[in-house]
From Swiss-Prot:
This is Cytochrome c oxidase assembly factor 3 homolog, mitochondrial. Residues 78-106 form a coiled coil. Belongs to the COA3 family. The gene is Coa3. The keyword Transmembrane helix applies. It comes from the Eukaryota.
Amino acid sequence: MAAPGAGDPLNAKNGNAPFAQRIDPSREKLTPAQLQFMRQVQLAQWQKTLPQRRTRNIMTGLGIGALVLAIYGYTFYSVAQERFLDELEDEAKAARARALERERASGP
């Protein structure tokens, strides 16, 4: 129950509180004082949420950067471990050597 003399906390006619009523600036013409107050409240809300948003953005950036570095490092590791082309070159050299030996053996 409200304190005595505090007034009716709810407007009995429309059920809205007498404060913080929603308005649509496109429908209602606002006074310069109302526009200034809206800007002031928006600025206060923005300043209140700025540190949290900045922290979240930094954490997201660090996470994406860590992912990029992990992929980059894994790529180098994977390429360094790859011996497929080396083995292929060794087989090609051995095949050329066998072909030369066959050519010499069957030669004149």
